């Protein structure tokens, strides 16, 4: 084989092996099983969003001060107003990404028209990945219901609203989803409430929780009336890798 061809073959082979190694490493670096009772804030494990807004339907600015751990051993997200018609909100997310497994949270959402309290996984273009997301969302206008949803490479419209039979804002309950290659199952207090099997997300994402007020989405959330402060409470979070 001529020398130049040998060099080119080695370069191509090396590039392929490098790409394979990066892919394998990225997969290996997804987080393992954990349980966080929020007896304190682990800044090596979690990150607080701070100083920016998602824009569009989000009518608030994320502030680190709106994410706190209380003396009751819970994480609390706040929606506040520092000045007239300006709003600050809270978002907490994991440092690492997580893949297939069981995601659980014990929480109480905030109750008020025009707001969302959530627990979800997310990854997207800002992370250099497709937009994949799995949601548990409470629309504050009616906290006797929960909304499940997911996105695969940016394609959504998988909303499912489930009647809980209780007001989620009044007491802690456990909500979960089990994400597997061919399905997602959502649970409330250990009981399966919804199953999806079509176009399931594949990309590991960060575990996230947020509380925010909307704008321009009154048909979905209802109109936010400016009431504040409002709080969403999170007793614990658990992930079991499968």
Which residue ranges define each predicted feature?
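Repetitive helical segments and hydrophobic/amphipathic motifs
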Residues: 14-15, 115
């Amino acid at each position: 084989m001529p020398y130049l061809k040998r060099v080119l073959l080695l370069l191509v082979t090396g590039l392929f092996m490098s790409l394979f190694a990066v892919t394998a490493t990225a997969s290996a670096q997804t987080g393992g099983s954990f349980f966080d009772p929020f007896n304190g804030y682990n800044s090596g494990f979690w990150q607080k969003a701070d100083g920016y807004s998602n824009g569009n339907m989000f009518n608030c600015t994320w502030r680190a001060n709106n994410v706190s751990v209380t003396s009751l051993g819970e994480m609390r997200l706040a929606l506040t107003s520092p000045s007239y018609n300006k709003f600050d909100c809270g978002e907490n997310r994991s440092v690492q990404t997580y893949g297939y497994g069981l995601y659980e949270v014990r929480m109480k959402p905030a109750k008020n028209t025009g707001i969302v309290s959530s627990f979800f996984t997310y990854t997207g273009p800002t992370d250099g990945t497709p937009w994949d997301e799995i949601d548990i969302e409470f629309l504050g206008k009616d906290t006797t219901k929960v909304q499940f949803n997911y996105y695969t490479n940016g394609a959504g419209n998988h909303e499912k609203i489930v009647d809980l039979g209780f007001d989620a804002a009044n007491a802690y309950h456990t909500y979960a989803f089990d994400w597997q290659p061919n399905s997602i199952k959502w649970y409330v207090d250990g009981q399966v409430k919804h199953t999806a099997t079509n176009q399931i997300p594949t990309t590991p994402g960060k575990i996230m929780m947020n509380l925010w007020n909307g704008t321009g989405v009154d048909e979905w959330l209802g109109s936010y009336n400016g009431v504040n402060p409002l709080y969403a409470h999170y007793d614990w979070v658990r992930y079991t890798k499968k």
